[in-house]
């Protein structure tokens, strides 16, 4: 099961019949809506399609609204695009004009006041570089330094220049409120520079009584420098390498990416690595070797999610791009040693919830558990378990559909819904039954369950239990690590053994001695109430290489003749064989 999540940007390419369905079935976890393009009505049509499909397929695909942010973009060209030649003059204007080979309108009216002669302006993530020659109240006259084709709405960056524009525009506020109304799960906040930017968005969400989570997009040096304070306010981070690679020396991007991922993992916040991950698949059905390595390295670094942009929004092969991401992630994860799995706590003292989550992960590793089941009211426990990166499958059992979708972004979590429980025992059994019915665990699996007492109170996770799916009939100490199965032959005396034992039975007795040796040789396994590891049962079991469990308290009373069971010496348990 893939632990790294996949974020896919929706657009014209995903509007084609059947494409969105195939993307979901191929592994898309989060649908990203880029509000730098499109209208509210266009986004609503796509969101409604996501809602309908996730309901039909029972897949917790989250919806992420990516804000326009305090960005500067070109407006429209008369013919949709122009070709700029090195050395030519080109003017950026605040006037409302259709663009051509000589000029184009921009979205930020104060840019002529913010730049000066000699400044560099980059278009379309640096595809074309301009040098400012002079400015007027409404225009910036430039020289084109390199040739390139420029299209509508491409980004405008001014490296090293602090723009005077406010963080949140009215358009962004309207978009966020639209997102609240339509039930989006995440806001990807563009161009976050400091914690105050996150708080500004949080105030809008709080006023609207919304639980939408905020992912801070780090795209410039100011955001990188303030990452620690941003992480304290945001619910997660996106390594937005497109504008970052324009605003910052591109040779620094790999180190910045690694550091950002490490900081996010250490504090338990999800981190999305984005931009040009499989860029060649916009046009080609297969990625380059460099792109495969880029995706894999982000996963090796510990990224929570990997993102597709133009590959799915406007590419020729959106479904293939998702399948490629999924395949790279699965193969890469198979090469990562998660046997101890946990990331050390970033500080000496943890909260009770975090400490319980950490203990659940280490317990699962110690006993070789098949899964960790985390029952969480608000998703906090599930987030903490995700933080410690266990090798075992992590099933997050939740009561709220939106929180279930939000957990779909977190590393390693498989979020499912469960019914509310009134007691601890009921909660544990309900969690196991729900996960088993979903096909995530099976009869005989060993699971670690973590939840809170009292039941149903958010933030009270303080309980860990180790459970066997299906329940063990008896427990004891296994001799060796073999397994066996067969019908039970429960006897309290040697005479009873002689009267009813048949070869291949699982022999259950209070103790053994040499009188029972012939029967022990022909038994599939032996279960004894005898406690001593140096006693007759254990010694004979080792000599005969026979599956043996000793110290099975009241086994002759609790087990019933003829029931077919499995005996697992490595775990010291006896279970009914599933039908």
Predicted regions located by residue number:
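Conserved alpha/beta-domain cores
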Residues: 8-12, 42, 161, 166-275, ...
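Feature captures the catalytic cores and cofactor-binding loops of soluble hydro-lyases/lyases
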Residues: 38, 42, 46, 392-426, ...
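Acidic, glycine-rich flexible loop/linker segments
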Residues: 70-169, 173, 434-435, 440-495, ...
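Protease-associated
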Residues: 350-358, 362-364, 466-519
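Structural preference for beta-strand elements that scaffold enzyme active sites
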Residues: 5-7, 30-32, 60-64, 89, ...
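C-terminal helical cap(s) of enzyme catalytic domains, especially alpha/beta-barrels
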Residues: 44-50, 202, 312-335, 465-467
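Expand to "…catalyze enediolate/carbanion chemistry for C-C bond making/breaking, isomerization
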Residues: 1-12, 16-17, 24, 39-44, ...
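Short beta-alpha connecting loops at secondary-structure transitions
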Residues: 244-246, 277-291, 304-316, 341-346, ...
């Amino acid at each position: 099961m893939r632990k790294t999540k996949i974020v896919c940007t929706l657009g014209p390419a995903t509007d084609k019949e059947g494409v969105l369905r195939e993307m979901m079935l191929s592994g898309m976890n989060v649908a990203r809506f880029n509000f730098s393009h499109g209208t509210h009505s266009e986004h609503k049509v796509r969101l409604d399609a996501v809602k309908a499909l996730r309901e039909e397929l029972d897949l917790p695909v989250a919806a992420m609204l990516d804000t326009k942010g305090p960005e500067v973009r070109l407006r429209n060209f008369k013919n949709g695009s122009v070709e700029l030649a090195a050395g030519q003059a080109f003017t950026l204007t605040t006037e409302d004009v259709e663009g051509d080979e000589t000029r184009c309108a921009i979205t930020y009216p104060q840019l002529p006041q913010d730049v000066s002669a000699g400044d560099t302006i980059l278009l379309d993530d640096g595809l074309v570089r301009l040098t400012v020659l002079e400015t007027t109240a409404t225009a910036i006259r430039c020289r084109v330094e390199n040739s390139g084709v420029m299209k509508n709405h491409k980004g405008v960056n001014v490296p090293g220049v602090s723009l005077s524009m406010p963080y949140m525009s009215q358009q962004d506020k309207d978009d966020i409120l639209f997102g609240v109304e339509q039930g989006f799960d995440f806001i990807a906040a563009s161009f976050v520079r400091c914690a105050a930017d996150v708080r500004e968005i949080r105030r809008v969400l709080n006023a609207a009584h919304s639980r939408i989570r905020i992912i801070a997009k780090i795209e410039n040096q100011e955001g990188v420098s303030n990452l620690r304070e941003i992480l304290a306010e945001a619910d997660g981070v996106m390594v937005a390498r497109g504008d970052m690679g324009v605003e910052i020396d591109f040779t620094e991007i790999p180190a910045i990416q690694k550091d950002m991922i490490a900081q996010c993992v250490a504090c338990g916040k999800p981190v999305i690595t984005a931009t040009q991950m499989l860029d060649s698949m916009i046009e080609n059905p297969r990625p380059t070797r460099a792109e495969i390595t880029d995706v894999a390295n982000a996963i090796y670094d510990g990224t929570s999610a990997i993102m597709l942009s133009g590959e799915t929004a406007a590419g020729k092969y959106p479904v293939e791009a998702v399948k490629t991401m999924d395949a790279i992630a699965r193969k890469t994860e198979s090469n990562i040693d998660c046997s101890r799995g946990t990331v050390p706590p970033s500080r000496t003292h943890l909260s009770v919830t975090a400490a319980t989550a950490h203990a659940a992960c280490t317990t699962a590793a110690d006993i070789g558990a098949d899964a960790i089941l985390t029952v969480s009211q608000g998703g906090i426990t599930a987030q903490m378990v995700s933080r410690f990166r266990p090798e075992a499958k992590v099933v997050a059992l939740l009561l709220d559909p939106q929180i279930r979708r939000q957990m779909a972004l977190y590393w390693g979590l498989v979020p499912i819904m469960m019914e509310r429980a009134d007691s601890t025992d009921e909660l544990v059994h309900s969690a196991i039954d729900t996960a088993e019915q979903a096909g995530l665990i099976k009869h005989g699996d060993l699971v670690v369950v973590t939840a809170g007492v009292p039941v149903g109170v958010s933030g009270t996770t303080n309980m860990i239990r180790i459970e066997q799916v299906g329940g063990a009939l008896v427990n004891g100490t296994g001799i060796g690590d073999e397994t066996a199965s067969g019908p039970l032959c429960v006897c309290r005396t040697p005479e009873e053994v002689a009267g009813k034992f048949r070869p291949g039975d699982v022999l259950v007795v209070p103790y053994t001695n040499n009188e029972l040796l012939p029967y022990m040789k022909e038994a599939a396994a032996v279960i004894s109430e005898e406690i001593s590891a140096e006693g007759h049962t254990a010694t004979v079991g080792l000599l005969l290489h026979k599956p043996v469990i000793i110290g099975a308290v009241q086994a002759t009373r609790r087990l019933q003749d003829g029931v077919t069971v499995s005996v697992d010496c490595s775990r010291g348990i006896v279970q009914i064989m599933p039908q």
